[in-house]
Amino acid sequence: MVGKKIIYVHGFMSAGSTHTAQILRDYMPQATVIAPDLPIHPEEAMELLRNLVKTENPDLIIGTSMGGMYTEMLYGVDRICVNPAFQMGSTITESNMMGKQVYQNERQDGEKEVIVTKALVKEYKEMTEQCFAQVTEEEQLKVFGLFGDEDPIVHTFDLFSEHYTQAIHFHGEHRLIEKAIFHYLMPVIRWIDDRQEGRERCTVLISQDTLADGYGKPKSSLHKAYELLLDNYNVYFVSPAPTNNPSVITEQQAWIEETFSAPAWNHAIFTNQPQLLYGDYFISSTEQPDFLGTVLRFGSDEFKTWEEIITYFERLGGQ
C-alpha cells in the first residue's frame, strides 16, 4: 500500500488512538493510516465517516466490530470488515455493556466515559437496519469479511454471506490482536493492493503430498515456508479430486483451512490433471514432466525438507 491512504474505523468504546491503528502503521510505514475518534451516537459517527471518505478519498477502509458495521455502509471503496457487529443493539445488551462504560483508549475530546442507555441501544438497532442497503455485484468485489473462528461476542458470518461472497474465517477471537493482523489481515490487504495496482505475482503451486507428515500434522518448517512465499508469490494448494471418493475434497479443504487459515481462502485447486495447470513453480513429491514451469521435487536430494525450499526461494528474491 505504498503511498496509499487507509481509514481505520475502531470498535465500540474504543478510539482512534487504539493500538490496532498503530500496528497497521508499523506494518505499512509507507501508507497513511487515518483513525478518527467516532461519536458515540451512530448517526453522528456515520456522518463523520462519510465526510471523511469524501475529503480523504481513501484507497482502503478497515473496520473492526462496530467499526466493521459502519465500514460495510461506506460504499464505493475497497473495505475489510473484521468481526463486524451487524447486530450492534443486541451485542450491547448481551455483552452487559449497558450503563456507565469507560473508553478503552484515550480520545482527543478528553471524554473518559459514557452512559449507555436503552435509547442509545435503539439508535444502534436502527443504524444496523441500514446495513446491506446498496449491495451490488461491484460492491461484492470491494468488500471482504474476516471472522474469528473463536469470537465469543459477534456471530455474523452467515448474515454477511447472505450479501457478500468474500467471507473468510481466521484463527482468532473478537479482538484483533497483532498476530491476527500479521498472519490473516495483511495477506488480504496485499490481495487488494495487487488488484488496485494491476500487479501480477508469480504463482507457486504446492502439491498436497508435500504438506503433512505420517500423523497428518504439518511438516516441519511448512508454516515458515508458507509465510515466506506469501510475501512475494500467489500460493495455491493442489489436491486430487477422486471421482469415486468426493469426501476427500471436503476433508482436504478442511485441513488446508485449519492449517493455513485466511490466506488460503479460495487458494485450493482440486484436479486429477495437475499437468494442465499453469504456474511458475510447482512443489511436488512426484515428477511433473508436463508442467511448463519450474518443478521443485520435494524429498529429493536437493529439496529434502521445507528448509531447502526456503533457501531456494530466498535466493530468488521474489522472482
Can you describe what each PLM-predicted range is?
Residues I62-E72:
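Gly/Ala-rich beta-loop-alpha elbow adjacent to hydrolase catalytic centers
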Residues P246-Q319:
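C-terminal cap/substrate-recognition subdomain and adjoining C-terminal extension
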